[in-house]
Design a protein with these regions (language model features):
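ABC-family P-loop ATPase nucleotide-binding domain
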Residues: 1-25, 268-274
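Conserved ABC ATPase "signature" region
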Residues: 126-159, 207-210
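A short, surface-exposed alpha-helical micro-motif characterized by mixed small hydrophobic
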Residues: 229-231
Length: 274
């Protein structure tokens, strides 16, 4: 137990760690967004990263994906230290991160979006892909059948030639998952994959994420919906004020609900999914 009375943040997960952070920090204009976060992501499991707004969740995901450097601390993928590696090097180790549709990806068709995913996973930057349209054409020759199959599975086949920016919010979430599957990662980082979608689509996306786990993918997802965490996540990391407040299963965190609620206020109710 930690001095906070919750589960020890440094406690090793039951399985081998696919990802590990040791004391990472990141400050912006002297204010710490992440302040000594330490945790492990169990291999082959779905882990939820939860906490109130401003807890440092997105900053942690940015650091893990190589989109941002940490100021101090260490990061590992398996046994390989990847502290402050650029994103293209981290991608080559099998890590893929979904993100909100950028202006550049929004200008591509739905099919082209899927075709960029293997290029990203191979370490190509988006800028390089856009400057070399022949790369997407090559991917279409080699992988169009697989991409169209995925679009059919995710209900986006009829939108294959539409610009991604024209999709609805829910369709964009499905496209993010389809891109991730197309990339065939070992580790997947999801930033609020079910935010702003209706309950029926939440259930569908949850099923797709469980399918990824069944295929051997390790998933780390930022999630605010504790019902979703209860239904599909194996492990939970709670961040508060840039620190790891607690780790474990949601059932374990409920045993410390009073302490957790004292730090998280009404933003996250650990009993909400009970």
């Amino acid at each position: 137990m930690s001095e906070l009375g919750v589960l020890d943040p440094a406690r090793p997960a039951a399985r081998a760690a696919a990802l590990r952070c040791d004391g990472i920090t990141k400050a912006f204009q002297g204010v710490h967004a992440v302040n000594g976060a330490t945790f492990e992501i169990p291999d082959g499991q779905i882990t939820a990263l939860i906490g109130p707004n401003g807890a440092g969740k997105t900053t942690v995901v940015n650091i893990l994906s190589g989109a941002m450097n940490c100021d101090s601390g260490r990061e590992f993928i398996g046994e390989t230290e990847v502290t402050n590696w650029p994103s293209h090097r981290i991608a080559r180790l099998g890590l893929f991160r979904t993100f909100q549709l950028s202006r550049e990806l929004g200008g591509l068709t739905v099919l082209e979006n899927l075709l960029t995913a293997p290029l990203h996973q191979a370490g190509e930057s988006l800028v390089n892909v856009l400057l070399r349209p022949g790369l997407i054409a090559r991917e279409e020759r080699e992988h169009a059948e697989r991409a169209l199959e995925l679009l059919d599975i995710y209900g986006l086949y009829h939108l294959r030639d539409a610009r991604a920016r024209e999709l609805s919010g829910g369709q964009k979430k499905l496209l993010e998952i389809a891109r991730a599957v197309m990339a065939a990662p070992k580790i997947l980082l999801l930033d609020e994959p079910m935010a702003g979608v209706n309950p029926a689509l939440i259930e569908r996306i949850g099923g797709y994420i469980l399918d990824l786990k069944q295929s051997g993918v390790t998933v780390l997802m930022i999630e605010h919906n504790l019902n979703v965490v209860e239904q599909i996540c194996d492990y939970v990391i709670v961040l508060a004020e840039g620190r790891t407040l607690a780790t474990g299963r949601l059932s374990e965190l409920r045993e410390n609900a009073e302490v957790v609620r004292a730090y998280l206020g009404e933003v996250i109710d650990v009993d909400a999914a009970h």
